[in-house]
């Protein structure tokens, strides 16, 4: 608002009447004391009538002054400049007074030009001189009521009103000093209209008005102060700080409110309450301040979800039972992927427990996640596969390891470079779970193959895309049905608590729900095909497809009908999916055969249980019934297939079946699963993806040669297939010694990387190793070790697992695939540093880590104080490491950056501690030795490596050329004329010089070089050639 030009202060007109007032003062002094109390009420009532009525009747009618011309009016005008302006009525009154009193004031001022200069004037004289000022309602609170005649009041009125545009500074200063010096009498409560609100009107009506110096005025008592501090002190002392905005609807005129309103005054209350609502509890508030206080007191701001909030459920409206159901089903975990329980209590119960998916929390912030973890711990500790809840993290870990449900978890962990650490207690618990007491006989298995459950499991498995998912869900249903149907047998049946997929489950599937095994077959086949093509969907560890490449391990065992699985190594010419060798023959239906293959753990049961099982038609009879026509074919095909095993243990397992003649068998018509006998003729070989997967896992983890520590009890099973050997139902097996087994069991045992009791059912291994024990007729043997590796072992042992070096085969295999693979294994130890893709640090080659650690230690420099400081490896050192190890420059740089980050943040890393103190301690990752200086540490690492770091440059060039020559030799030997001819028919344009594989685009070759040969992008052009050039 533009400020008007200030005029020079005029002399107060009151000084001219000093003598007159002295005379009148003595006369009226008595009257003032008598009418003192009455004048206070009169001056207070003047506020009601002196504003609008004076405009019509003039100032003489009632004899009271207008409020607008007193010092209080100046203050109110100043207040109006800050908040609102004067009313029209007050402006017109001041105009009338200023017109009538201008000449009189000039005349009086000229007649008495002398100013009162005596500072010792008494207080009575000053009160008489300025009675006109003090008669206003501004001073009514002080009780200074003076009764003046109408003429004197008119003169005072004209003298005081020097115009709307002038401000009497001197008079204002005197009134201020008078306010400070006058003793305050009893202050009566001001009337309703004594506050400034009476004079406030809209600024649009009267425009801008400047009234003088800045003042701070109390609304209730109209006291003015120079500073805000004084006004604040006054308000605190008198309690005048109550906000009267809440009374505005009742007390204020209905014209307009002040311009600066609160943000929500223009809104309806309903609209404000819709906006001002706590997102957690749903309470509404009238003002933002109330909402803020509520949020701070209740700490609901920590619990507001970032996504759509949960619909508030009143505790009064929801019964405790429904609230418990709501808590059970609410997915509080940020990683929760489903809002329903997958635990199948019963179809009706699970249907009632479902909640709408829109009640999810979504991803939370940290505070919200902490709160929800405490509130819904059992829901956060939930299996992401089957939805089962657990009270502690250890229980969840045990459940996920036993069921194999943690593939998704390990998938995300492997992407972050983390290794799943298994609790030793949980591992022991799993081991104890997998073993059954010798003297304990299994209770009769509850019927879990009801149509409803079979249907449910079938539909569940169709939704799942992974083998382990199907196992876990089938097992969950089996366990739950046992809990509900046979609660009395729960303490008697030790397998109820087991989370493995047991033979009973597969037995039910083979009778009623064959889709289970069909689904397993399809998923395993898909997984192997994807792994062969380098795009695995099964991501339990960073590079699972390396497990399928058969680079250093054994070959897959003979499957049903002597089927050969064409899994080529990674450097092979063309990677082909699994397909039957004889293309003209159709595949036999697999589900039944797979179910028969899994009947393994039955041999761990007592003979009483065996008799019970024999009393009814069971898949054991099915196995024996259809194994007869296959016996001859396998005995013919087996000799060449035996030599395909590079390791001795599988040789023994496969050679035994052909040397033993099966006992008389039941007719084929005893099959109870409805499969035709023709499906099992030797002319129809079938794929067994589970056997292929088993061989792959055994190859990768070294578990294929695990010995059976004790003989199994005589079993009523007999099958002459190469992977399962079972005798007749009613005749005890005879010990059989295989003539081709050239090594004793003791020599086999040293091929084991580890022995674990935590293995589910065996899908491939033979159970006829009774020849290696003297207790062949024992029926109370402990359970056998099964080789379908528990996924927990895979995660735990994979970084340390090294496949045993294969023994030379005694026979020449007929298939070219095995010849190529054996040739490749001859140089696999040297090629391993190049052809294996490097993963995260958990899967690094230990030799590469030693080299990197030694180089990093050599880069540290020592200061004059004896402290060691970080330095950086130069490009030359990094290039030497890259050439020697085959690691890319990017990988080396990332490793160095990670080590530096850990040292700066925590002061230490795995091989280097106390770096922040300047006196590092070096740790050898191989032997855990400690060293104080980099030189001794480097020399120690060189002793592990077998060479000195300074010789690494020379060795790098030699090794590079040697390895590339070997790779080229092996790869060229692997190429057969048919594959080369088939390759030339395609649109391949580029070729890898190292392995002679061809690709459609140059980009594909570069990806191949990076992934297969670990070549950095800087060297890609050296190893790419056009097919047309040759």
UniProtKB/Swiss-Prot annotation:
GO cellular component: nucleus
Residues carrying Phosphoserine: 976
Subcellular location: Nucleus
Region described as Disordered: 1-120, 240-266, 328-348, 432-488, 608-687, 703-726, 759-784, 965-987, 1009-1030
Segments forming C2H2-type zinc fingers: 216-240, 276-300, 381-405, 922-944, 990-1013
Keywords recorded for this protein, A-Z: Coiled coil, Developmental protein, DNA-binding, Homeobox, Isopeptide bond, Metal-binding, Nucleus, Phosphoprotein, Repeat, Repressor, Transcription, Transcription regulation, Ubl conjugation, Zinc, Zinc-finger
Record PTM text: Sumoylated.
Cross-link annotation Glycyl lysine isopeptide (Lys-Gly) (interchain with G-Cter in SUMO2), location: 189, 307, 316, 418, 462, 480, 497, 601, 652, 796, 816, 962
GO MF annotation terms: DNA binding; zinc ion binding
Statement: the UniProt record of this protein carries the keyword Phosphoprotein: yes
Gene3D superfamilies xref list: Classic Zinc Finger
Biased composition (Polar residues): 39-49, 66-95, 334-348, 432-459, 773-783, 968-977
CDD domains for the chain: homeodomain
Compositional bias ranges of the Acidic residues kind: 21-37
Superkingdom classification of source: Eukaryota
One GO-annotated biological process of the protein: regulation of gene expression
UniProt record similarity statement: Belongs to the teashirt C2H2-type zinc-finger protein family.
Reported function: Probable transcriptional regulator involved in developmental processes. May act as a transcriptional repressor (Potential).
Assembly: Interacts (via homeobox domain) with APBB1 (via PID domain 1).
Identification of the protein by name: Teashirt homolog 2
